[in-house]
Each structure stands twice: as C-alpha cells, then as structure tokens.
Amino acid sequence: MESEAVIAQGGLERIGIPGSRLKLVDSKGEKVTIEKDIAGHEEGISLILSVLTDEKLGCIKAYNEIDAVGHRVVHGGEKFASSVLIDDEVLAKIVECCELAPLHNPANLEGIYAMQKILPGTPQVAVFDTAFHQTMPDYAYMYGLPYELYQKYGVRRYGFHGTSHRYVSRRACEILNVPYEKQRIITAHIGNGGSITAIQNGKSVDTSMGLTPVEGLLMGTRCGDIDPGVLTFIMNKEGLNADKVSNLINKDSGVLGISGVSSDMRELEIAVKEGNPRAIIAMSMYGYRIKKYVGAYAAAMGGVDILVFTGGVGENQTSMRKAVCQNMEYIGIHLDHAINDTIQGKEMVISTPESKVTVIVVPTDEEYVIASDTQDILGNQV
C-alpha cells in the first residue's frame, strides 16, 4: 500500500447482549471505551462510523472518504482460495458456507449486510480465514471417512487463522531477508484459540485445525485433538445430544476444563506458580500438544528452516515458547534463553546464531492483510 499508517483502531464487544461497548484508541493514542447497548451489527457499525467522523475522536470528516471496506470471513470452504470483491454471487456462496461455520459466518454476513445498507455503493472485500490453506494436498486435508461424505457435505480439513499464518510467515522472511518461496516454515498462532501451519515453498501444506476450529491444539475452551469414540461414549453416559456435545468441546473443555481455573493463560500461569496441580497438568498439555505438531510438521516437510511464534501466548508468554522449544535441539532448534525471556509483543529472533532453525516472534496483523488485500482488489477494479 502507498501509505501503511494506522489512523484508527478499535473493536465492538458483546453485540446484542448486556454490557456492549466500543473500545478504541483515539488520534492521540489514548484508550477510550464507550459504553452503549448495541442491539445488532447495523447499530454497531453506525456507532463506529459516527466515532470515525467525530471531531475529537475521529480521523475522517465524512463517510465519502471511505474508499472500500474489508471484512474478515471465517469460512470460505472450497469456494474461495483468495480474497474477493463482494457481489451477490459471492454473498450466496458465503451463505452456503454457513453450515460449515454456523457460529461465525452468519455474524460475518451481518456485518457485510449492515455496511451495504449504511454505505451503499462502497466496494466491499471478503478475506477468508480458510483461503490460505486451500493449497493443502488432498492426503493432508482428507479424513479417513467414507469418501461420499466429502462429496456430499464437504467433510475435510479446511484450517483457520489463514490470514495470520500468511502474514507472519511472509513477515518473518522479510525480517530475515530470505526468499519466501524457498523456505520450510512452521507458524504457531497460539492464544485462547490456536493453530499451527506447515508452509513449504510459500504454500500451506498442512494445518492443525480441521473442518471446524475445534481440532488440533489444546485451547482456552476447546478440546483440540480427541478420539472421536470419546464423544459417543460421553453421549451415552451423560445423555447428551449433539448440541450439548458441541457446547462441551467448544466452550467447556481445553485448559479451562482441565484446570477448572480459567481459559486465560495468564491466569493459568499464576495458578501454576501457586502449585495448583490441575493447572500444572493443563499447562503441560498445552505446551506438549504444540511441541508434537512442530515435530510432526518438521517430519512432513523434511525439516524446518523457520519457526514463528505469534498470537497472544506466542507473542507474550516467554515460558511457553521455552517449553515448546525445550529438547528440540535434535531438529536444529536452539533457543537463546536470555533474549527469549525479554521479548514480549515485538518482532525478534529468539534463537542462537548457531541454531539451524531460526526461531522468531512476529506479532500478527490480520487487519493489515485485510486492508492490503482490499487495496489490491480495489486497485484492480479501477
């Protein structure tokens, strides 16, 4: 982009439920919170636009200064392998993908519809979480289920956090001044939700999340990898239906379910230091699962050149990065503990000069990717 300055940032929380608020950083860099009941997305976007044009808090004078709008859309299925300009056909395909992401795509659509109503005629672009992973080979994305289920319902691995994995992998190569298309990269986006991706020669070749964001790593409230037979066993024992099982594995499991303390890794770390035995188990499981995926993806790619940590935990929790890299010298990972212990939330190489694998922290910036893709697509339409 010609100009890459951030002129406004913020987000709406708790839309449609009590306690909704808009958090933003004003033009002076001060954090501001506006408490206001927000019934739906249209009302929320109207509030955002009123703030953007506010004389004191805003950065533009009128809505017509907005050239385009970029949207994050969680699931594009096999229909989208890149970001696209939104039209009626694209909207129809996003609607078709709602059954694959019933918790996310409908909300994404609400934002698009609201913006179309408030800013009619303004170009809008959809940037899909799943698009980056559409380069996976079939043997990586297929499940060992009857092939007809893939043909009828699209049951396969799709992966998520693609916008983040794309950004941090490219940014790491820019920092290291190495060609993106010639690297074997493992990106670890770890936080309350988390996923790991193997990127070989500039393409995603495998990723830990699956048909849904539940598969893979142990997360804040999601169980991650689990024997499917466990679910039918629990359904029979507890008398649970499909909706209750979905709630169990999405909202009641993960480090929260194991520890009984919190889904927040910062609070879990405090509990570990206090000697809470269940918190210790949860923390150990969290790191162990990440380590296993790093080893698996190194095997899948025949080695690894760069390991990237990002996400809330990856960027800030030094102890977790240490735990993941411990005893990984056999594949060429040598952590510089003195540097690692001081790095939080900023770009930095945290491996030793002798390390065959470069380990680097790269704060993610999905909003930049959305803005960049929107600019690129808008430019192509002119």
Which residue stretches match the model-derived regions?
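Short glycine-rich, Thr/Ser-proximal phosphate-binding strand/loop in the N-terminal lobe
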Residues: 1-39, 210
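Phosphate/pyrophosphate-binding loops at sites that engage ATP/ADP/AMP, CoA/4′-phosphopantetheine
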Residues: 51-66, 172-179, 294-305
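Short beta-strand-loop/turn "lid" adjacent to the catalytic site in phosphate-handling enzymes
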Residues: 52-104, 125, 131-140
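Glycine-rich beta-strand-to-loop/alpha-helix junction loops that act as flexible
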Residues: 71-74, 190-193, 304, 308-316
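Glycine-rich phosphate-binding loop of actin/hexokinase-like ATP-binding domains
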Residues: 132-237
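Catalytic phosphate/nucleotide-handling subdomain of diverse soluble enzymes
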Residues: 200, 205-241, 247, 311-342
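Adenine-nucleotide phosphate-binding core of ATP-dependent small-molecule kinases
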Residues: 247, 254-258, 265-300
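Internal helix-turn-beta structural module
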Residues: 280, 284-308, 314-382
